[in-house]
Amino acid sequence: MSLSTNQVRVPLELVMNVLDSAYYDDEPESNVQLFTNCALVCKDWSAIAQKLLFRRVTLRSQTDYIAFQQAVDRSTARGRMLGDAVRSMRVTLDHNQPYYLSQRSFARAVTLCPNMQDLRLAMYGQGSPGHDVVGAPDVNRMKRAAPSFDERTLALLRTGPSIASLQFSNWSDNSSTLFQLLDVWPALKSLAISGVPPQLPNEAPQPFPCALDSLRMNFQTPPCIDFMRWLLHNSTDSLRTLELEREPTPDMLKYLLAHHAGALQSLAMPTCGGHEGTAAIRQCRALRELRIESPWTPPTLCKALPETMEHIAFGVDMATPLPPILQMIKRSETLKAVTVHIWHGGESHPQLNALKIACARQGVELMSTTDVREFRSIALMVFASDQRDVIHSSTSVAGVIY
């Protein structure tokens, strides 16, 4: 009696659901390894796995671009499938690299991805031959010029997808590139800008037309209020998320919250500057999430927060005053999550167990970490779970099977 050799094929719909569920946004390298292996299982799995691999791509050199261009060649069905799968692209423009990605190639790569929603672009100033560390955003490099985008490159970008999210890190002294990029994409909803603070040109352009939903800033020195007024002219009623990775000046914080507190739902800052900071935050009556990285939180802050709060994230060291936070947790009917960044000595705080008990009794999820980068990521993910679908991670094309 012979054994049956009939094979039962797993339905493709089930395979798609399983692989899509396995996609891990926060560990792009693990995605490369996982889906490269999945692509080798069989022909049916290969197309599904490769589409997931191409969901987020990274281009750092002309070599990367050539490989990517060949893979997404739109004259072939496979190329169109992979190009259509791209949702997020991370690009580095650095003329100091041996085989750097040209601006024209960057623009062509964007046009090959009609469904792309998110672009993360880093630009570095061009220096004379020397002892540069490639990709290092040090002070000297930030004083170097980077070429502006030429008209042909800008025209190419305008023929590409209408992206919703732009992250631009400018490590050069050329402020015009930011204004060029913002002029290309008139439908942006999310903007993250860092590096050298932009300067408005002498002949100020028309106010930025986009109604932004989210803004994140991390400049070496504070931008001028005139720039913020220009950038957020049409975002008074739309800005829901504001993330300031460096401490703003009192005047800047006062200006931002005076004009945007009404719609703001998520606010992140390194510190809360005493009475002035508390008074500014008090204006945010629709706030759902607050993240303060400093281990010192003014005791009056918790009383200033609205009843709409769902997530609070803060730092803890040995001297952090926790009683006001404990009281807020106990009385809140809307709080869903608490995130704690444990600073040096914070693990020995005498009221840390009381915090755990208060969260457990109220059914509030408590998360903690000693890594500030993980702290920021956790805080963002909590609010993102039901508010955002913008992509913020990437996968290198180097691991894709061509």
Whereabouts are the PLM-identified features?
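Short regulatory "switch" loops immediately downstream of catalytic or recognition motifs
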Residues: 18-26, 33-35, 121-130, 195-197, ...
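Leucine-rich repeat
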Residues: 70, 95-266, 270-282
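Hydrophobic regular-secondary-structure patch
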Residues: 3-102
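Amphipathic, non-transmembrane alpha-helical secondary structure
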Residues: 12, 16, 20, 66-76, ...
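Hydrophobic beta-strand segments of well-ordered beta-sheets in folded domains
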Residues: 55-57, 84-91, 116-119, 162-166, ...
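Leucine-rich solenoid repeat modules
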Residues: 2-6, 13-25, 279-402
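Acidic-and-aromatic substrate-binding clefts and catalytic sites of carbohydrate-active enzymes
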Residues: 57-68, 97-100, 174-175, 199, ...
